[in-house]
Amino acid sequence: MAYYQQPHDITRLPAWQALQQHRAEMAGFSMREAFAGDPRRFQRFSLDSCGLLLDYSKNLITEKSLELLIQLAEQADLHEAIAALYNGERVNASEGRAALHTALRSPIGRRLLVDGNDIIPEVHRVLNQVTELVSRIHSGLWRGYSEKPIKEVVNIGIGGSFLGPQLVSEALRPFTQRGVRCHYLANIDGSEFRELTARLDPETTLFIVSSKSFGTLETLKNTLAARDWYLAMGGPEEQLHRHFIAVTSNRKAAIEFGIGEENIFPMWDWVGGRYSLWSAIGLPIALAIGVSNFKELLAGAYAMDEHFTQAPLAENMPVLMALLGVWYTNFWGAQSHAILPYDHYLRNFTKHLQQLDMESNGKSVRQDGTPLDIATGPIIWGGVGCNGQHAYHQLLHQGRLLVPADFIVPVNSYNPLSDHHQWLFANCLSQAQALMQGKTREEAEVELRAKGLSEDEVQRLAPHKVIPGNRPSNILVMNRIAPFNLGALVALYEHKVFVQSAIWGINAFDQWGVELGKEMGKEVYQRLTGASGEPASDASTQGLIEHFRSQHRG
């Protein structure tokens, strides 16, 4: 039976039990000693594919560790899970859906059936629709109600309709096309809306409403506010269709809003929001960087898809990263994972991965509904280097928590300034080196004596200078941030997340916790506004509602 119907209890697999024993054997393992004893450790534990170099040599692993982790993947039927994903089986068991985001970057000519229909022609039809729209806007043919060309595009969406597109359009800023500026409106906070629209001219602004249901609370409220702003600023209602387009599966609601049928782009139920930047949800990306660069992004993701499905497990970049995550989460007690991009243009990468990973693998039951008694998805956090070095890296180096980290860095910068990039790259490497190597008590004492301190001062300060080391990290290196390797990078993490979900036996494609919060939010709103006189079900919520009602002046 398929893994998504009857997943394994991995704790009963022989490889899991062997890994538990191996973990005990690794109690005294030292990465510093491992490097000293093996000059080829980097060569043995690194991998180059799709424009990305993965150095995973600074991990708490031996050849035996990897052998056992690969055995775990095999015994958990990972090959079958990957095949099920790509064949369009209903791997999202709780919602009875396939998860075919990979089809969005498949080249024309391939064939993939969903409910008996080949979806690849439809995917490329929509891509052609995106191409045509982008061409009209970039050429100045699409004009607003006053016949001025569109110069500002505002994407209204939240979650996957926002985080992925924002990440890519910001990361590929050097590829930005002239003439059109893209903005993002996500939060249901009037301050964000006011600050954005204060900089816009309604005559030259186009809004993209990105919502599968055309009813997501934050997106709908911001869309209604945008329409009110457009009308208040003098925009005629009969010309609304020139200033609003939609990416949605609810065509009826979009048409009722005033959006022209020809300006509605479809969404499919086999694409989850956090995996949707490759679809028409990526329209703001294509507007920002141009269609040819958007297609390069798709090509990079497709290259990673091919690597993922064809490379042996022991040479498979997403699989190796996923297994290392399982190793630390389930056998070393790690509860979080740091994402540390050393590039200004990747400053939003961590935010995208937070949704991708935590919304996918933050689960506590298996696909069949049986409870898990092991940890699953870790907390994803981090930020851009070198800023983090002067903030939270202290915890990574000397804290009591084990926090595996991924460093991401390009070799070349689009903006060379003196020797800045050499220093940036050096800091990235040295942070990973310091996490691995640390500083012993003896080294700390020698360092302090060399500074001329008295022996009493040496003994007083030495404990504070000791850095434990042996902290694991990966380093991902690319030539420079470009559409192809960025597509590969994002797809790499998508596949990593899926592999972990398959091993844990959980559903990476639903998010029922998010849905509960939405439902309860409606109830609280009714009480806040006085529409419901019933008290909240707990005293804390009721007390805060009463405080709001007594103080609110909005």
Curated annotation (Swiss-Prot):
Entry-linked InterPro entries: G6P_Isomerase (IPR001672), G6P_Isomerase_C (IPR023096), Phosphoglucose_isomerase_CS (IPR018189), SIS_dom_sf (IPR046348), SIS_PGI_1 (IPR035476), SIS_PGI_2 (IPR035482)
Catalytic residues (positions): E359 (proton donor), H390, K518
Keyword Cytoplasm recorded: yes
PROSITE patterns in UniProt: P_GLUCOSE_ISOMERASE_1, P_GLUCOSE_ISOMERASE_2, P_GLUCOSE_ISOMERASE_3
An annotated Gene Ontology molecular function: glucose-6-phosphate isomerase activity
Localization, UniProt: Cytoplasm
Organism domain of life: Bacteria
One cellular-component annotation, GO: cytosol
Catalytic reactions of this protein: alpha-D-glucose 6-phosphate = beta-D-fructose 6-phosphate
Entry keywords, A to Z: Cytoplasm, Gluconeogenesis, Glycolysis, Isomerase
Keyword match Metal-binding: no
BP-aspect Gene Ontology terms: gluconeogenesis; glucose 6-phosphate metabolic process; glycolytic process
Pathway: Carbohydrate biosynthesis; gluconeogenesis; Carbohydrate degradation; glycolysis; D-glyceraldehyde 3-phosphate and glycerone phosphate from D-glucose: step 2/4
The EC number(s) this enzyme carries: 5.3.1.9
Main location: cytoplasm
Top-tier EC class: isomerase
Family: Belongs to the GPI family.
Protein name as it appears in the record: Glucose-6-phosphate isomerase
Gene name as annotated: pgi
